[in-house]
Amino acid sequence: MKNQNTPIAFEGFPFIAGFAALTLLTALSAGKLCSAILYGFSALFALLTLFSLYFFRNPQRTPPADERAVVAPADGTVIVVDRVPVTPLGHEALKISIFMSVFNVHVNRVPFSGRVVELTHTPGKFFDVRDSRSSCENERSTIVLETVSGLRMAFVQVAGLIARRIVCYARNGEMLERGKRYGLIRFGSRLDVYLPPDVQPLVKLGDKTIAGETVLGRLG
């Protein structure tokens, strides 16, 4: 799996470079032509460059010392905490869903250490990720992970109305480490986490999460 330690996720480099080049080009052209319109475009591209730097930021995070703690895979707001019968695990599980707005960090992190036993990408629709249909009908990337103790959990990157580009660095059979970066979704999206049904949730609806740090629950 790619190990990104750069302060900006490399998926953002084409956007940043492109907008920065357009900023410079329009500024130089505006100076030569004395064009207020081109100056306006230059200012717009400069703002888009700054927004891209902000959107693709990739801050360092430190997981809690408790090795039983399952951490949030994304920055955002908890929109689902429920035990559901239909899951990627094939049985009832505790489901915790996190909504990422366009203003959240969009780098995704591994909730718990373990081995990838199943990795699937499912084409689908692009409902708003706050719509309950998005979990089972939207395009998504699903990882089923098995811990060293044999417990299984799943975490799902869900594409949304605007976010239509899922990036997942993980590979089948790979060992993942809790808190490490494993993917990204562009421009607003959702992460679903499925835990064993006996896990007690440590977050509630409306709570804000920090990827790699906020504890969602603890495995027994």
Curated annotation (Swiss-Prot):
It is a peripheral membrane protein. Keywords: Cell membrane, Decarboxylase, Lipid biosynthesis, Lipid metabolism, Lyase, Membrane, Phospholipid biosynthesis, Phospholipid metabolism, Pyruvate, Zymogen. It comes from the Bacteria. It holds the Pfam family PS_Dcarbxylase. It catalyses: a 1,2-diacyl-sn-glycero-3-phospho-L-serine + H(+) = a 1,2-diacyl-sn-glycero-3-phosphoethanolamine + CO2. The modification Pyruvic acid (Ser) is found at S189. Is synthesized initially as an inactive proenzyme. Formation of the active enzyme involves a self-maturation process in which the active site pyruvoyl group is generated from an internal serine residue via an autocatalytic post-translational modification. Two non-identical subunits are generated from the proenzyme in this reaction, and the pyruvate is formed at the N-terminus of the alpha chain, which is derived from the carboxyl end of the proenzyme. The record marks G188, S189 as: Cleavage (non-hydrolytic). The active site is at S189. Its EC number is 4.1.1.65. InterPro entries: PS_Dcarbxylase, PSD-A. Its cofactor is pyruvate. Pathway: Phospholipid metabolism; phosphatidylethanolamine biosynthesis; phosphatidylethanolamine from CDP-diacylglycerol: step 2/2. The keyword NAD does not apply. Disulfide bonds: none annotated. Binds 1 pyruvoyl group covalently per subunit. GO terms for cellular component: plasma membrane. GO terms for molecular function: phosphatidylserine decarboxylase activity. Transmembrane segments: none annotated. GO terms for biological process: phosphatidylethanolamine biosynthetic process. It is found in: Cell membrane. Heterodimer of a large membrane-associated beta subunit and a small pyruvoyl-containing alpha subunit. Catalyzes the formation of phosphatidylethanolamine (PtdEtn) from phosphatidylserine (PtdSer). Belongs to the phosphatidylserine decarboxylase family. PSD-A subfamily. This is Phosphatidylserine decarboxylase proenzyme. It comes from Pelobacter propionicus (strain DSM 2379 / NBRC 103807 / OttBd1). The lineage of its organism: Bacteria, Pseudomonadati, Thermodesulfobacteriota, Desulfuromonadia, Desulfuromonadales. The gene is psd.
